[in-house]
Amino acid sequence: IGTGSGYAAAVLGRLAASVVTVERWRTLADAAHQRLRSLGYDMVETIFGDGYEGHLTRAPYDRIILTCAVSDPPPHLLAQLAPDGILVAPLTAGVVVRTDKADSAARRTAFAVATVDPAVHGVARRL
């Protein structure tokens, strides 16, 4: 969640068979899409949309990684995880947490300290 230049999506594309990345800024989404295609990252699908809402169409996901801070991992994103899926999110409190989904429960583990811009709801047309 949070495509930006597409760098993180490209790295993840080297590790996974397919990657869906969601960006709220159309100009960033379009540029990242073209950049990733030109570099051969056909396994990365770039979506222009409200990343805070995730992308239900392609759910469930094995992993969801946020590049923007949230106060708490949104329940609707956890719901888009596959069984045994993992969500990684920086929190506005300054820590990065890993949330493991197991059956109907979720277990959270803090594993890093980071300061990241907060998530913003909605979409934007241009940067």
Where are these regions (language model features)?
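Active-site capping/gating segments
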Residues: 90-127
